[in-house]
Amino acid sequence: MSTETELQVAVKTSAKKDSRKKGQDRSEATLIKRFKGEGVRYKAKLIGIDEVSAARGDKLCQDSMMKLKGVVAGARSKGEHKQKIFLTISFGGIKIFDEKTGALQHHHAVHEISYIAKDITDHRAFGYVCGKEGNHRFVAIKTAQAAEPVILDLRDLFQLIYELKQREELEKKAQKDKQCEQAVYQTILEEDVEDPVYQYIVFEAGHEPIRDPETEENIYQVPTSQKKEGVYDVPKSQPNSQPLEDFESRFAAATPNRNLSMDFDELLEATKVSAVTQLELFGDMSTPPDITSPPTPATPGDAFLPSSSQTLPGSADVFGSMSFGTAAVPSGYVAMGAVLPSFWGQQPLVQQQIAMGAQPPVAQVIPGAQPIAWGQPGLFPATQQAWPTVAGQFPPAAFMPTQTVMPLAAAMFQGPLTPLATVPGTNDSARSSPQSDKPRQKMGKESFKDFQMVQPPPVPSRKPDQPSLTCTSEAFSSYFNKVGVAQDTDDCDDFDISQLNLTPVTSTTPSTNSPPTPAPRQSSPSKSSASHVSDPTADDIFEEGFESPSKSEEQEAPDGSQASSTSDPFGEPSGEPSGDNISPQDGS
């Protein structure tokens, strides 16, 4: 019976110890609760305190422990015993109290404890190193029971304090950063919010663009506020063919006084036939400058040149009633590149005789495919000054400087005197105007009836292959078959006067090379179909320009009143007749 009772007591005691070991929770919350306040209390005896040289070291602690035990052994031989104490472990550190009096003997904070060591010879003894730099001491303690639980509590305490300190520092740092951000934001808000710098930094994400991109003008365009008459915006895209609406609006902007219903068809036809090339942009080199054409839209080629109407305003009384006088002719003295067929056409010889004695002023260069406003006879008021138009006073060397500056490409009209390949074109304005049929038939049959051509001397540089001029009319081809090929680069007028036989021919039969059908209107701006409609006698004047001087002398008497009224501003003798002064009634 007694044996069973002893066994039951032993089982209960062991169970309590096991449950105490298994049930010990070392979580953070439990440890905080454990070391809060007075902390954990242990009964022990103080072995002694010894000064050491370093803050860490296991050998250092073991040597100090053996030294203190030797001191205690000598005192015990004298009958002295170790001091009984109890120590507490808390967040405040290690505190040692006297068991009898309860007085605080020693207090060492956690940050002062630098090393903890266990005695390798006695499981109930341990020690720790405490103190500040230069004053380190080793405290040796012998516990009532095993020293391992005390050492574990000290380890947990140090680990918990370290983690709490790290977390506190992180929280402080985060709080400090947040406070700094809040302070900066508050400073920005307190400052002038209208400052564009702060707007860009703080409020950039919520703002829309100041200007709508669709309303912004293209950087390659001429600003609308700086637009002038004849200056156009650069289109954003370059289509192959311009729409008719865009063409009509540009033409109306350049020529506000033109009648679009009359001239839109012919200008549209000219635009279709004449392609925009580098050579066409600078016009014809062998054609005299225009003296009556209205100002044309500004282009990169003639933006620095004055308009022809401003240069020579006093010539409308001589050529105002003539159809060829109102046609704008590109200048040949600033032009570059080869002559294209679309700029020749049915050019009368009368215009080649305009420049007398001196080089005329340079007019603007007319681009090839830009719609040009060709002046009507009544658009410009008559003035008091006129050009001398005496045909016999044209100096051959008037245009000699153009030989070295901008030579004419003679290959455009080289080759034997063979009929040029022509492509008949359609003319809506001429088809709709029956008044122009009769003058055109007469021009095709009788324009060259009083001339005979002398075979020009062979030119070595000419090639056997004659280029085909697809943009010329039949009258243009017959014109060159009768008169000759284009002049070489040495001369800037169309023909060499010395090579023409001016002997009149009595035969009135039309040339076999001249086609009987009406010649279609060419794409050259030298003469438009509107000129035929406005003045049917222009073809008669065109015929008179090719007549011999003898015939002109015969007609000088009826036209004496008109010739005498025309003054000669260049001081040239006005006794010789001119093809421009011939009356249209005589030509018919």
From Swiss-Prot:
Could you tell me where the Basic and acidic residues compositional bias lies? 15-26
Disulfide pattern: none
Residues modified as Phosphoserine are: S524
The biased composition feature labelled Acidic residues covers 537-546
**GO aspect biological process, one term:** reelin-mediated signaling pathway
Indicate the principal place this protein occupies in or around the cell: cytoplasm
Phenotypic consequence of K45A: Impairs binding to PtdIns(4,5)P2
Q: Where is the PID domain?
A: 36-189
Effect of altering Y220F? Reduces phosphorylation by SRC or downstream kinase. Abolishes phosphorylation by SRC or downstream kinase. Abolishes interaction with CRKL SH2 domain
- Tell me the domain comment: The PID domain specifically binds to the Asn-Pro-Xaa-Tyr(P) motif found in many tyrosine-phosphorylated proteins.
User: What protein am I looking at?
Assistant: Disabled homolog 1
Question: Species lineage, top-down?
Answer: Eukaryota, Metazoa, Chordata, Craniata, Vertebrata
